[in-house]
From Swiss-Prot:
GO terms for molecular function: ATP binding; ATP hydrolysis activity; ATP-dependent DNA damage sensor activity; mismatched DNA binding. GO terms for biological process: mismatch repair. The keyword DNA repair applies. It comes from Thermus thermophilus (strain ATCC BAA-163 / DSM 7039 / HB27). Residues 516-545 are annotated as: Disordered. Keywords: DNA damage, DNA repair. The keyword DNA repair applies. Belongs to the DNA mismatch repair MutL/HexB family. This is DNA mismatch repair protein MutL. The lineage of its organism: Bacteria, Thermotogati, Deinococcota, Deinococci, Thermales. This protein is involved in the repair of mismatches in DNA. It is required for dam-dependent methyl-directed DNA mismatch repair. May act as a 'molecular matchmaker', a protein that promotes the formation of a stable complex between two or more DNA-binding proteins in an ATP-dependent manner without itself being part of a final effector complex. Disulfide bonds: none annotated. NCBIfam families: mutl (TIGR00585). SMART domains: DNA_mis_repair, MutL_C. The gene is mutL.
Length: 545
């Protein structure tokens, strides 16, 4: 039942403009349809929606006696209190705003009602009468934003973008968009992967991994990109909470970046969609006209990070600090998830060119060697410190001596020592891989003590960088192949310990598309290039260190 909201709720909800564009109007009407349980929605735009806008659904419908209230301000059937928002629309403002801005026509019929109702409204004039009608609701808006010089094509683009976004969060909705009578979007409710092809393009959608994870009444589903796909902005990372599209909270974005830390270059973001299903106590919605901002509980944010890490482990893209174990013999497919790479050539004495199946790989030789050495160091550190052949004296400055009690993570994992007078300690144990370097040991101890590496992994990343083969160093075929074979034994071959990409992959179909050839027609047949929106830029090549 539609009812007016009490004054105290009206004041809290009266923030900002409701309708600024045709896209805003479509959003409000689409959310009403989804709240009504619609499984099919049809949107029609004439003159970009400025002349005429139609949204028709097969949802529950509005009873005849409630139609006049539907176009009154702050009248809604969806909200009892601010703590119980469970629908997409809740302010009771949308139809009233349309009534004030344009001519409004609503035809609706609940499934249990014999006949339907028709409402005609413009300004303060409202007329309601019974009419025959199919189940559901049809809203027609005429003359929206008249005389404002709007661009019809721009309005259509905005609506199309909006509908693709909503399909990522409601992939079982059958949705159609027509502009000037021409079909611009026909989606049969075919699921999330098909919705992703619409939103991201076919090529990018093929590089997304399905995500499904739940714990403690919290659940996340979605699609997220593999390491070879990234953006320098989080503008292709979409979030919804209980079906409501919302902006990514900063806290959650930090969690996502942390999960991808060893897979993506610094400053890069993944691509994809996350659909969160949470109880009311796990989030708080900001009450403004756009309804796009949300505050998530710590448990909800942690769930997403756990889900991503579990996915990466399952796909062999990432692994926590490994237990010591012997390396397994190399056999395709490898533990890394990569096929065995065949060395082709070295380019500019910095990059290795390799192939596997229908894919060409470009490998940064320094980043690859860093990753190999880093994972070897991780395994050796997991064995714990070993007694030094003879104790080693280390001199400490007063500020360094004061840090001994802080118990730095890297310090405790790498060394055992004992006080040996003021400003001195005697090293008793250290990782076996450091034993041959007695001159380096004091510096590593001090760096771990000062926490300059920030963590054990960061310190090991610095140690791996020093001996790694540098850009500009020539490698022969045997050396190049050995480096590639060693890379395939890594748990995370996609990125160096600092987060820069190790390799880029270019599939044969990408070459065919970019050269404008027909797929499979290697004899020289030409074809028109595919539309630009189907392509997606690879991550940029890493700079030389």
């Amino acid at each position: 039942m539609i009812r007016p909201l009490p004054p105290e709720l009206r004041g809290l909800l009266a923030r900002g403009e409701v309708l600024l564009t045709v896209k805003d109007a479509v959003r409000e009407l689409l959310e009403n349809a989804l709240d009504a349980g619609a499984r099919r929605v049809r949107v029609e735009l004439w003159g970009g929606g400025l002349k005429r806008l139609v949204v028709e659904d097969d949802g529950e419908g509005i009873p005849l006696e409630d139609l006049p209230l539907a176009v009154e301000p702050y009248a809604t059937s969806k909200l009892q209190d601010l703590e119980g928002i469970r629908t997409l629309g809740f302010r009771g403002q949308a139809l009233y705003a349309l009534r004030q801005a344009a001519r409004l026509r609503i035809r609706s019929r609940p499934r249990g009602q014999l006949g339907g109702g028709l409402l005609l409204a413009e300004g303060e004039r409202v007329e309601v009468r019974p009419v025959p009608a199919p189940p559901g609701t049809r809203v027609e808006v005429e003359g929206l934003f008249l005389g404002e010089g709007r661009d019809p094509k721009g309005e259509v683009r905005g609506v199309l973008e909006l509908l693709k976004r909503y399909l990522l969060h409601h992939p079982r909705l059958a949705l159609a968009l027509f502009a000037e009578g021409e079909a611009r979007l026909l989606f049969p409710g075919a699921g999330l992967e098909e919705a992703a092809r619409l939103a991201f393009g076919r090529l990018l959608a093929k590089r997304l991994l399905p995500l499904a994870y739940g714990a403690g009444g919290l659940e996340v589903q979605g699609l997220v990109s593999r390491p070879e796909v990234s953006r320098t902005r989080p503008d292709r990372l979409f979030l919804a909470v209980n079906g409501r599209p919302v902006a990514f909270p900063e806290g959650l974005l930090r969690r996502v970046r942390r999960a991808y830390r060893e897979l993506l270059p610094e400053g890069h973001y993944p691509v994809g969609v996350l659909n969160l299903f949470l109880p009311q106590e796990a989030f708080r919605l900001r009450l403004d006209a756009r309804k796009e901002e949300v505050v998530l509980s710590e448990e909800a944010e942690a769930l997403v990070e756990e889900a991503l890490l579990a996915l990466f482990r399952r796909e062999n893209l990432a692994r926590a600090l490994p237990e010591p174990k012997p390396l397994q013999p190399l056999s395709p497919p490898t533990a890394s998830g990569l096929p065995r790479l065949r060395f082709l050539a070295q380019f500019r004495e910095s990059y290795l060119l390799a192939e596997a199946g229908d894919t060409l790989y470009v490998v940064d030789q320094h980043a690859a060697h860093e990753r190999i050495l880093y994972e070897d160091l991780l395994k050796r550190v997991a064995e714990g410190p070993k007694p030094l052949p003879r104790p080693l004296l280390v001199l400490l400055a007063p500020e360094e001596e004061a840090l001994l009690e802080a118990g730095q993570e890297a310090l405790a994992a790498l060394f055992r020592w004992e006080p040996f007078g003021p400003g001195r300690v005697r090293l008793l144990m250290a990782p076996a891989f450091l034993h041959p370097y007695p001159l380096l040991l004091p510096e590593v101890f001090k760096e771990a003590l000062r926490g300059e590496g920030r963590s054990l992994k960061a310190l090991l990343a610095r140690l791996a960088c020093l001996p790694a083969v540098k850009a500009g160093h020539p490698l022969g075929e045997a050396q190049g192949q050995a480096l590639l074979d060693a890379l395939l034994t890594c748990e995370t071959p996609w990125a160096c310990p600092h987060g820069r990409p190790v390799l880029l992959a270019l599939k044969e179909e990408d070459l065919i598309r970019r050269f404008g050839r027909r797929s499979g027609a290697r004899g020289g047949g030409e074809a028109r290039p595919r539309p630009q929106e189907e392509s997606f830029p690879e991550a940029p090549l890493p700079r030389e260190p």
